[in-house]
């Protein structure tokens, strides 16, 4: 007689074992109709899952995040079924859920075309309308291998053979389609109501370029048509804001095949980069960091001591000189420890905050590269705080304040906080993990910040907090992080003399706010669609003459504003003024100063914004004040 405890605390007693769907029906027919899965004692299960003992149960519907996840997983199976219905020779491989959607990889003799995607999506809709039951079954490994060999599914046979277990394997069927899967899945295909296939791309089997090239079909699925429509609108907006397109249009940067994953910064893009760097440098001084600079190429022995050679060797660019192995640094931390190690430190020196705009390189797979968002050469706003265990919470609290200030200045006010705690394999005692996790949690709580715990997601050497900012499209970008490290200082011999005159190893906090300059600039480009706030804009004001008679006055204004540190562009071309205004507006210049005879006579400027707002005629000093006010408020409204 299982007793089922529901999320509101109420209990329901049953005389026999029941399924999740039985319980939903007992609560009400509406809930039974809406159910896509269940959570039994915190574990996500099928609606057909049998409960034969006391348990806590939550019915999962399309309104729940877990419900949407199940719908997406089942959509991948629906996609595979549709493809094999139209193209029987296509072999299925894997079809996982990804952020906002799903994909499935197929082995097929030719690439799928856009017309193919239309047909496949129509078939998916047909199969959804058929409302086919989705059923779970178990097979032994040998039975499964035999079945999929008969079906000609070589990739599934390989997957099954690679599973290190003799236990029965679970399979899901709908109609005549069957797939190996842990589940859970929706109870019937009719639950998959809002989906869209988005694109097709090539993908190597198991991500290895030595293996066969497969066809990967991407799609998105949601709990209802309204959410799907909203998502497709966001995608359309994201495409309009693609930093690669805008970067090219505004002449900010380019990338080319001869230097994959490396950025060619153009004048305006480099100006933007420098504005950000100068801003961050000023903030570092304000928050008592010491800026350092360390070598880019370091001998293998240091990377072996730090552990990077063993764990990241394949991601490092290496070279040789005079029979010695060197690596271009993929990160800055081991070099920062070397700076700390110069001279014997005292507890009075702690906390010591060392910062670097560190140029790093990682040998990312070429298929993973994506504009500024995923590169091989990048600069981190990196810093490492050497402190005692007792100082962790205070230092993390100060860092959070620093991070909030920076994000607000760049126009980001919504931040998501996630605390990753100890994994199974780790270094350090439980006592120091307890202290460190509590210090991070207490630092977040002291600021009144909501945070989510990610159990087991910390690095082997310490827990961390990740900070993700939300952009204007509601997308999350994980940029900031603060990471406790118990391992590296000891591995590299970092020590300080305590107040008891005993040599101790400091704790090291890895921290970054922007993450990398390149990726952060990509985020800014998309967030602002290239229309940067005045303080960031490569050109803050364009001075436009109406005729040649005003050229000298325009040059004079340009000199005055340049001398005050503003970024000015003179446009003295013999073009119609409306043409100039349109061109600089399209180039997203925040302010346009139009100069005609009247402005020369009154020693003023006619100011308008890129939005077309006429700010009227103002003196040079009044315009300077306007620009200064824009600088002062930065991106804050």
From Swiss-Prot:
GO terms for molecular function: ATP binding; metal ion binding; threonine-tRNA ligase activity; tRNA binding. One of its GO terms (cellular component) is cytosol. GO terms for biological process: threonyl-tRNA aminoacylation. Keywords: Aminoacyl-tRNA synthetase, ATP-binding, Cytoplasm, Ligase, Metal-binding, Nucleotide-binding, Protein biosynthesis, RNA-binding, tRNA-binding, Zinc. SMART domains: tRNA_SAD (SM00863). Residues 242-533 are annotated as: Catalytic. Binds 1 zinc ion per subunit. Residues 1-61 form the TGS domain. It catalyses: tRNA(Thr) + L-threonine + ATP = L-threonyl-tRNA(Thr) + AMP + diphosphate + H(+). Its EC number is 6.1.1.3. InterPro entries: aa-tRNA-synt_IIb, aa-tRNA-synth_II, aa-tRNA-synth_II/BPL/LPL, Anticodon-bd, Anticodon-bd_dom_sf, Beta-grasp_dom_sf, TGS, TGS-like. Its cofactor is Zn(2+). It is found in: Cytoplasm. Zn(2+) binds at residues 333, 384, 510. Catalyzes the attachment of threonine to tRNA(Thr) in a two-step reaction: L-threonine is first activated by ATP to form Thr-AMP and then transferred to the acceptor end of tRNA(Thr). Also edits incorrectly charged L-seryl-tRNA(Thr). Belongs to the class-II aminoacyl-tRNA synthetase family. This is Threonine--tRNA ligase.
């Amino acid at each position: 007689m299982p007793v089922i405890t529901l999320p509101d605390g109420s209990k329901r007693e049953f005389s026999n074992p029941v399924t999740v769907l039985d319980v939903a029906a007992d609560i009400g027919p509406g809930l039974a109709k809406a159910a896509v899965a269940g959570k039994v004692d915190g574990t996500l299960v099928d609606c057909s899952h049998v409960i034969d003992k006391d348990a806590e149960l939550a019915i999962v519907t399309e309104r729940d995040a877990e419900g949407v996840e199940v719908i997406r997983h089942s959509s991948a199976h629906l996609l595979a079924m549709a493809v094999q219905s139209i193209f029987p020779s296509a072999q299925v491989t894997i079809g996982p859920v990804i952020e906002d959607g799903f994909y499935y990889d197929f082995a097929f003799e030719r690439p799928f075309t856009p017309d193919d995607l239309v047909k496949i999506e129509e078939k998916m809709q047909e199969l959804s309308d058929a409302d086919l039951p989705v059923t779970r079954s178990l097979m032994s490994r040998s039975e499964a291998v035999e079945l999929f060999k008969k079906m000609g599914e070589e990739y599934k046979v390989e997957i099954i053979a690679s599973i290190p277990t003799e236990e029965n394997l679970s399979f899901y069927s709908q109609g005549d389609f069957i797939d190996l899967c842990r589940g859970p899945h929706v109870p019937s295909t009719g639950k998959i109501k809002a989906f869209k296939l988005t694109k097709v791309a090539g993908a190597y089997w198991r991500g290895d370029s030595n293996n066969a090239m497969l066809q990967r079909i991407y799609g998105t699925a949601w709990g209802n048509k309204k959410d799907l429509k909203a998502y497709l609108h966001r995608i359309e907006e994201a495409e309009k804001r693609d930093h690669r397109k805008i970067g090219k249009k505004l002449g900010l940067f380019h990338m080319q095949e001869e230097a994959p994953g490396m950025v060619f910064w153009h004048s305006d893009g480099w100006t933007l980069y420098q504005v950000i760097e100068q801003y961050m440098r000023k903030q570092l001084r304000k928050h008592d960091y010491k800026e350092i600079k360390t070598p880019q190429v370091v001998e293998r022995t240091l990377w072996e001591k730090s552990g990077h050679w063993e764990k990241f060797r394949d991601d490092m660019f290496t070279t040789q000189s005079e029979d010695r192995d060197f690596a271009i640094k993929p990160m800055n931390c081991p070099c920062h420890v070397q700076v700390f190690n110069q001279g014997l430190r005292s507890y009075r020196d702690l906390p010591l905050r060392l910062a670097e705009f560190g140029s790093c390189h990682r040998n990312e797979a070429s298929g993973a590269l994506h504009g500024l968002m995923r590169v091989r050469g990048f600069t981190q706003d990196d810093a490492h705080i050497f402190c005692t265990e007792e100082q962790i919470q205070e230092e993390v609290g100060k860092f959070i304040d620093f991070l909030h200030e920076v994000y607000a200045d760049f126009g980001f006010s919504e931040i998501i906080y996630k605390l990753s705690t100890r994994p199974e394999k780790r270094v350090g005692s439980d006592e120091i993990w307890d202290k460190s996790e509590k210090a991070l949690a207490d630092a977040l709580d002291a600021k009144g910040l909501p945070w989510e715990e990610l159990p087991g997601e910390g690095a082997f050497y310490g827990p961390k907090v990740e900070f993700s900012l939300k952009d204007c499209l509601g997308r999350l970008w994980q940029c900031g992080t603060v990471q406790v490290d118990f391992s590296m200082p000891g591995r590299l011999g970092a020590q300080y003399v305590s107040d008891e005159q005993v040599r101790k190893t400091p704790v090291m906090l890895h921290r970054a706010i922007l993450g990398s300059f390149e990726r952060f600039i990509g985020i800014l480009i998309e967030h602002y669609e290239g229309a940067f706030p005045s303080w960031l804009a490569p050109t803050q004001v364009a001075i436009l003459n109406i005729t040649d008679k005003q050229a000298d006055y325009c040059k004079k204004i340009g000199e005055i504003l340049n001398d005050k540190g503003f970024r000015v562009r003179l446009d003295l071309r013999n073009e119609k003024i409306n043409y100039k205004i349109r061109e600089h507006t399209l180039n997203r210049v925040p302010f346009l100063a139009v100069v005609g005879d009247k402005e020369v006579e009154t020693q003023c400027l006619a100011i308008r914004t890129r939005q077309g707002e006429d700010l009227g005629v103002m003196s040079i000093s009044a315009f300077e004040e306007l620009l200064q006010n824009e600088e002062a408020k930065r991106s804050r409204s």
